[in-house]
Amino acid sequence: MMFKKCLSVLFTCLIFISSARAQLVIEITSGADQLLPIAVVPFGYEGVDALPEDIAQIVEADLARSGLFQPIPRSNMLSMPSKEADVFYRDWRLLKSDYVVIGAIKKLPNNQYRIGFELLNVLSQKPVQKHSSIDVSARNFRDAAHYISDKVYELLTGTRGAFSTRILYVTAEGDKKAPLFKLQVADADGHRPQVVVESKEPILSPSWSMDGRKIAYVMFRNRRPNIFIQELATGKRQQIAQFRGLNGAPAWSPDGKKLALVLSKDNNPEIYTLDIATQKLERMTNHYAIDTEPSWEPDGKGIVFTSDRGGNPQIYRLDVNSKRVERVTFEGDLNTRARMTPDGRYLVTVQKNDGNYHIALQDMKTGRVQILTETYLDESPSIAPNGSMVMYATTYQGKGILAVVSVDGLVKYRLPSADGDVREPSWSPYFK
């Protein structure tokens, strides 16, 4: 039931989005020190027509991308069972696999398929996940595979998987002097990219609503920045900020009722909140310095933002009720683009040290700071809804790409694009 509900949200959110050809391609660059060996056996199928997707291959790629698992190559498998009764656990012990994912696919009427799967513990020779099945259409095979990946990941790590989530990002294609900007949405693995909106002027700061049904972003018109809200299911777009001067950096509140944004209509960039239903605007900061890049705390009680009120740009926290402001970051030459993990434990920033911009993680309890990346010109971090990974924009071989790093800094991979530069990533919430 949960899978069908999430699938419905995903499908309806994408009805009015046009197709895009060039997808992001994952290149894993490092993983955890001790990987968990797991075999994802090709799912059994007795039909005569070709399947839309290789379910097992997608699950295997998802688990490998997490940096926590070491999939057993298919070419090494001694057998390929599709149900537990056919499993010879000795085969998998010889391959030193700790777990095995098996499954079978059955064709149903009306172009539907039933996908069954199990997760088996090789050592105990017992199921971790007993046989479970989901019914999907041909177009939803990738969704089914990501769902299975999420289940396996959660069962073996205790953390909810984020393979079924999506990402927003902006590409700049064509002539570098006059590029075409495209706001695109894709699966978290870069597959199935689709264009949400395109423009000959810049598109910036895409942000998801907490139910995943709407997005906010900045799009320039006649060289002036304007803020829009757009429904993914209908394509309906609403311009919600077109004040004189700067209109920028929209960020949804956790309850989805407000946007934090940056306006300079009163002659200086300040943080405001906008009640989406009533259009009531409230000024939250009042300082001669530049206040920008707001991001809500998970409980909605505070907003972290960038300000140069202390000299160089650093991160400050604004109490939403009292409007009291306090400084949060003290290490590094500067810190910008703050994002907080869903549990509120860590703050992710872009930190500059000795001329280098890297993604940094600050423990909000201890104050300890860890530099997570070694890439070049890192910017725009966005955190997965389970708090395990940070996606960010960087430069690789002279081209703007997206990259991902785990919050412990051990797992890293790139998502290069075949077309143009890629910037401004935004990781979706879980679809409810």
Curated annotation (Swiss-Prot):
For this protein, the record's NCBIfam families field holds:
propeller_TolB
Keyword Cell cycle part of the UniProt annotation: yes
Q: Name one GO cellular component term.
A: periplasmic space
Give UniProt keywords alphabetically: Cell cycle, Cell division, Periplasm, Signal
Q: What does this protein do?
A: Part of the Tol-Pal system, which plays a role in outer membrane invagination during cell division and is important for maintaining outer membrane integrity.
Q: What is its main location?
A: periplasm
Q: Which PANTHER family match?
A: PROTEIN TOLB, PROTEIN TOLB HOMOLOG
Which InterPro entries does the protein's record reference? 6-blade_b-propeller_TolB-like, PD40, Tol-Pal_TolB, TolB_N
Record lineage: Bacteria, Pseudomonadati, Pseudomonadota, Gammaproteobacteria, Oceanospirillales
Q: Where does the source fall among the domains of life?
A: Bacteria
Q: What is this protein called?
A: Tol-Pal system protein TolB
Which Cys-Cys disulfides exist here?
none
Q: Please list which residues make up the signal peptide.
A: 1-22
Describe, as the record does, how this protein assembles with itself and its partners. Answer: The Tol-Pal system is composed of five core proteins: the inner membrane proteins TolA, TolQ and TolR, the periplasmic protein TolB and the outer membrane protein Pal. They form a network linking the inner and outer membranes and the peptidoglycan layer.
Positions the record marks as coiled coil are none
Mind listing the GO biological process terms from this record? cell division; protein import
Please name the source species: Marinomonas sp. (strain MWYL1)
- List localization entries: Periplasm
